[in-house]
């Protein structure tokens, strides 16, 4: 029971730290003039390789 409480406490702490960092970053972005810079999101290297067919088809690289 003690290890479960300890684990939950660590997860709670990490969540609070993560939330705090997100708030700081958002505040910093607002101070820069409120502009949101769009960045191209690179998709995973295996995009298009995974199909619902079995056996899986080989991946054709880009």
From Swiss-Prot:
Signal sequence, start to end: 1-22
Lysine amide PTM sites in chain numbering: 60
Keyword Disulfide bond attributed: yes
One of the protein's GO biological processes: defense response to Gram-negative bacterium
Subcellular location, record wording: Secreted
Tissue: Expressed by the skin granular glands.
Disulphide bonds in the chain: 49-59
Prodomain positions: 23-43
Source domain of life: Eukaryota
Family: Belongs to the frog skin active peptide (FSAP) family. Brevinin subfamily.
Name under which the protein is recorded: Ranacyclin-T
């Amino acid at each position: 029971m003690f290890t479960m409480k300890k684990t939950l406490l660590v997860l709670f702490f990490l969540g609070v730290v993560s939330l705090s960092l997100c708030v700081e970053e958002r505040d910093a972005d607002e101070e820069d003039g409120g502009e949101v810079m769009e960045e191209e999101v690179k998709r995973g290297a295996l995009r298009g390789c995974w199909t619902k067919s079995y056996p899986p088809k080989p991946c054709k690289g880009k």
